[in-house]
Amino acid sequence: MARILNIEIPNNKRVVISLTYIYGIGKSLASEICKKANVDENTKTAELTEAQLSKLREVAKAYTTEGDLRREVTLNIKRYMEIKCYRGIRHRKGLPVRGQSTQKNARTRKGPRKTVAGKKGK
């Protein structure tokens, strides 16, 4: 297995797909990295030479990925909650942040239903 940005990427897959195993790199960014490194997207990771791997590492290092990206995202969410903007309030309440309706849906974000006891002796 090749190692890029301290992540083991699979050898049996194409380079573009293998790069997506790194948090913060999707398909479009992976193909962009391959173009900058002059590596064919369709070659398998196992077939890459050490020079090509080092070029991929060098190009991928320029992007925010893995721990730095996770930290940045969590700090952004904390900042939203501190300044009490709409998104921060939704995060704090555990409700959907991006405008989805919550009257009938949003069970994943709200958690399981809290049942209310009905009237006795009908």
UniProtKB/Swiss-Prot annotation:
Keyword Signal carried by entry: no
Subunit structure of this chain's protein: Part of the 30S ribosomal subunit. Forms a loose heterodimer with protein S19. Forms two bridges to the 50S subunit in the 70S ribosome.
Annotated GO CC locations: cytosol; small ribosomal subunit
Identification of the protein by name: Small ribosomal subunit protein uS13
Domain of life: Bacteria
Keywords: Ribonucleoprotein, Ribosomal protein, RNA-binding, rRNA-binding, tRNA-binding
One BP term from GO: translation
Hydrolase listed as a keyword: no
An MF annotation (GO) of this entry: structural constituent of ribosome
NCBIfam families the UniProt entry points to: uS13_bact
InterPro entries: Rbsml_uS13_C, Ribosomal_uS13, Ribosomal_uS13-like_H2TH, Ribosomal_uS13_bac-type, Ribosomal_uS13_CS
The protein's role, per its UniProt record: Located at the top of the head of the 30S subunit, it contacts several helices of the 16S rRNA. In the 70S ribosome it contacts the 23S rRNA (bridge B1a) and protein L5 of the 50S subunit (bridge B1b), connecting the 2 subunits; these bridges are implicated in subunit movement. Contacts the tRNAs in the A and P-sites.
Residue ranges with Basic residues bias: 106-122
Region Disordered, residue ranges: 94-122
Family label: Belongs to the universal ribosomal protein uS13 family.
Any Pfam family: Ribosomal_S13
